[in-house]
């Protein structure tokens, strides 16, 4: 059972469905406390803990605001299972969006100890415990920080003088006439009016981007009630000018524990998040690519007139690409609510025996709306004095995608822990039932003439609509036995019996056992008496079975697939 006392977490480590003393661990478990987590300030929790746990590998694959796509693995394997406050959550993206100021500890199960989570534990497990209140006067804390980011290295590109010189040399070396005359080359080299070098990167990107995070929290408690609450805000800006790409996140958390009677304790944990990402229609990579591909002799505006974006020969004008009002934009938003209600009862007259029931309800609402606007770029005729328009992104397009999901998880847990002289034994049994539902719908329409970004204002012909729903269900029985003799000799046996909706009725259940032993050599007299500088030396061994809930569901049903195209007749497909 996860204890509500924050102080107790100082010398214990959160493991699957419980806590254990550090010195009693028999598995490979890394642990980070709150001070280690918040020491590094970053928009993503993954970046904040990078490099702080042995065997934990985190590779940031995308620095774009709102893209929580860091690759997280334990000991080089695949993505681990993520457990937040005792509940299996939606994976790496949700973990990375957590407010670091709300976290008390993170445990990393690296070996067979992860088997207690059964299916989907093949790559280890990451267990997050959020802050709980502690006895004491109310404490109000305000944390705020501002960060500045900049590219590690930006490739240096040729300017107009260098570019034209190399173009001329390339043509001459190939036995062809020079690309431009000597007089024109001199003008490019001197930067004469109309022959200025254009740095497209500087025209589109700032040298630095800003980040801001703040959290206001309140915590405290008495012998009857303990509480922790917080509100957080974070923003992450990109290098793009005009604030074309931004991410904003609002979070709240409320963890309250109430001692109803001497033996009965209730807890209510609430967590919520609302975050939005605003970006141009064009992907960040395409914008960056445009600043690299187009030559430095092409100006942003035709005839240097800011009313006319210049028409580029290779890829679209990057300045037009980041102008959301002109070329289109996209907005992504998430609404997430996590609720957890628990009752814990210490059984009278049976010392060390307690039972706990937990009900979890999570809700997530996702929306994505993107508008591609048709736009024009121009070429200026020096002799005619006229602007010739070229169309791009026609016809205009609107995409509107929605997804709604909910999770219901019920856990019943029995714990027994008792010390008899030099012997300490522990036993845990958990029954868990988890159910998840989701539905989604995607719509797309094109415009004959763009007015406002709503599907009803676009044409009905050539529209695309898709959608579906899913229903998942899981049952689990979990057991664990621990033994400790004099704090020297340690043993643990654990097992999980998992059932998944994904497979055929006769093959839905799987058994995941694990065993581990430990020997605290530092507690032996021959170490204590001769090597006083050794305070904790342990030899341990673990083995277990883990799995992966892989594959599409209901593949055991017979089905058929028609060949593409043609018609279906009574005798077959033609």
Task: Set out the residue ranges of the language-model regions.
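Residue-level signal for secondary-structure boundary sites
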Residues: 8, 22, 136, 150-152, ...
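Acidic, glycine-rich flexible loop segments
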Residues: 174-198, 213, 286-320
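Glycine-rich, Lys/Arg-enriched anion-binding loops that position phosphate/diphosphate groups
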Residues: 279
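Extracellular/periplasmic, surface-exposed regions of secreted and cell-surface proteins
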Residues: 37, 212, 255-264, 269-274, ...
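Short, small/polar-rich motifs associated with maturation and membrane association
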Residues: 1-253, 265-267
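Core alpha/beta catalytic barrel or barrel-like domain that forms the active/cofactor pocket
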Residues: 284, 299-301, 379-380, 492
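N-terminal start-of-domain structural block
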Residues: 104-105, 112-163, 249, 351, ...
């Amino acid at each position: 059972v996860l204890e509500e006392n924050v102080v107790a977490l100082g010398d214990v480590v959160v493991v699957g469905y419980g806590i254990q003393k550090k010195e009693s661990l028999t598995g490979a478990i890394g642990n980070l406390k709150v001070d280690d987590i918040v020491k590094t300030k970053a928009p993503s929790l993954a970046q904040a803990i990078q490099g702080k746990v042995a065997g934990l590998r985190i590779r940031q694959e995308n620095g774009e605001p709102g893209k929580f796509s860091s690759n997280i693995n334990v000991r080089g394997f695949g993505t681990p299972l993520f457990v937040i406050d005792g509940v299996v959550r939606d994976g790496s993206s949700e973990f990375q969006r957590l407010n670091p100021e709300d976290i008390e500890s993170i445990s990393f199960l690296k070996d067979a100890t992860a088997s207690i989570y059964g299916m989907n534990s093949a790559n280890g497990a990451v267990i997050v415990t959020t802050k709980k209140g502690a006895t004491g006067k109310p404490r109000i804390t305000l944390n705020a920080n501002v960060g500045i980011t900049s590219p590690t290295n930006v490739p240096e590109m040729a300017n107009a003088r260098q570019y034209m010189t190399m173009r001329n040399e390339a043509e001459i070396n190939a036995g062809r006439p020079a690309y431009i005359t000597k007089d024109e080359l001199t003008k490019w080299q001197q930067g004469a009016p109309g022959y200025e070098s254009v740095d497209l990167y500087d025209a589109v990107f700032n040298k630095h981007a800003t980040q801001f995070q703040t959290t206001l929290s309140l915590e405290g408690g008495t012998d009857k009630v303990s509480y922790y609450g917080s509100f957080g805000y974070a923003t992450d800006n990109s290098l793009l000018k005009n604030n074309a790409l931004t991410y904003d996140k609002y979070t709240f958390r409320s963890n309250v524990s109430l001692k109803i009677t001497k033996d009965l304790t209730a807890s209510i944990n609430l967590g919520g998040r609302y975050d939005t990402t605003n970006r141009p229609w064009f992907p960040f990579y395409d914008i960056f690519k445009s600043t690299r591909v187009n030559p430095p002799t092409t100006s942003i505006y035709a005839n240097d007139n800011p009313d006319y974006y210049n028409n580029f020969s290779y890829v679209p004008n990057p300045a037009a690409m980041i102008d959301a009002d002109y070329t289109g934009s996209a907005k992504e938003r998430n609404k997430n609510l996590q609720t957890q209600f628990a009752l814990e009862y210490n059984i009278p007259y049976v010392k060390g025996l307690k039972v706990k029931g937990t009900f979890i309800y999570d809700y997530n609402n996702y929306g994505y709306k993107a508008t591609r606007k048709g736009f024009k770029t121009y070429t200026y005729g020096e002799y005619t004095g006229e602007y010739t328009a070229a169309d791009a992104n026609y016809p205009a397009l609107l995409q509107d995608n929605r997804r709604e999901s909910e999770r219901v998880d019920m856990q019943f847990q029995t714990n027994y822990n008792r010390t008899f002289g030099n012997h300490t034994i522990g036993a845990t049994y958990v029954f868990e039932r988890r159910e998840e539902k989701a539905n989604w719908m995607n719509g797309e329409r094109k415009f004959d003439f763009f007015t406002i970004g709503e599907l009803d204002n676009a044409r009905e012909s050539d529209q695309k609509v898709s959608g579906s729903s899913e229903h998942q269900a899981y049952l689990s029985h979990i057991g664990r036995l621990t033994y400790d003799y004099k704090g020297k000799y340690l043993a643990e046996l654990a097992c999980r019996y998992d059932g998944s909706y994904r497979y055929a009725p006769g093959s839905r259940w799987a058994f995941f056992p694990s065993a581990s032993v430990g020997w605290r050599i530092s507690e032996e007299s021959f170490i204590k008496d001769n090597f006083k500088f050794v305070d904790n030396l342990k030899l341990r061994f673990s083995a277990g079975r883990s799995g992966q809930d892989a594959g599409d569901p209901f593949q055991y049903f017979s089905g058929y697939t028609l060949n593409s195209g043609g018609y279906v007749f009574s005798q077959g497909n033609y």
